[in-house]
Amino acid sequence: MAIANKNIIFVAGLGGIGLDTSREIVKSGPKNLVILDRIDNPTAIAELKAINPKVTVTFYPYDVTVPVAETIKLLKTIFAQLKTVDLLINGAGILDDHQIERTIAVNFTGTVNTTTAIMEFWDKRKGGPGGVVANICSVTGFNAIYQVPVYSASKAAALSFTNSLARLAPITGVTAYSINPGITRTPLVHKFNSWLDVEPRVGELLLEHPTQTTLECAQNFVKAIEANKNGAIWQLDLGQLIAVEWTKHWDSHI
């Protein structure tokens, strides 16, 4: 998918990886970039507008834990303005295994609910034009950081959901792929809580090993968007973009 002249909704587009990805996206010249985030950041929005004045950058406050009906209401406003949306990026995430319910609500349920809401406008069975979903998951969905099992499991769930979305594309007209960053130097990683405090230094220990910058991750994210491969499981790690081949251990045969 060429980003130029497209309409993109980016959930959590002002976070660590999110903001650098938003910067790279506006450089590529979409028609509209609509950012949905829990916390407004007027300085960041102004910066994005300045990077490419031809791009219309819009912000709406959004909490991914709201009911689906609330998200549909917000999307109605956005679709009324844009008429069409080409790409939805689900990027909301927290890393704090003290907050068990919220971790699941943000990292998994929020992704499911936001995707479910946009189906009201995209699903070809409802007369929709289809669309593309890019879900930010994590390499911990492949193999857990076992000291944060709740976070890791929430990302594995989001990855499984995304893989199913891709398989449903012939029915819905909506394609999907996952973005799975490795350890990236963001405020999220510097200090966070392990489950039951099994390892108080888990963030510090991770940063003792090779990592990547948010810019490296963002640049590869844009490459994945441009590749636009339904069902792709993209690993964005150590500055590289790798297509992961998923090993099938079981099949429902339906």
Swiss-Prot record:
One of its GO terms (molecular function) is alcohol dehydrogenase (NAD+) activity. The active site is at residue 151. Homodimer. NAD(+) binds at residues 10-33. Substrate binds at residue 138. Coiled coil: none annotated. It is an enzyme of class 1 (oxidoreductase). GO terms for biological process: alcohol metabolic process. GO terms for cellular component: cytoplasm. Its EC number is 1.1.1.1. The keyword NAD applies. The keyword Ribosomal protein does not apply. Keywords: NAD, Oxidoreductase. Belongs to the short-chain dehydrogenases/reductases (SDR) family. It catalyses: a primary alcohol + NAD(+) = an aldehyde + NADH + H(+); a secondary alcohol + NAD(+) = a ketone + NADH + H(+). This is Alcohol dehydrogenase 1. InterPro entries: ADH_Drosophila-type, NAD(P)-bd_dom_sf, Sc_DH/Rdtase_CS, SDR_fam. PANTHER family: 15-HYDROXYPROSTAGLANDIN DEHYDROGENASE [NAD(+)], ALCOHOL DEHYDROGENASE-RELATED.
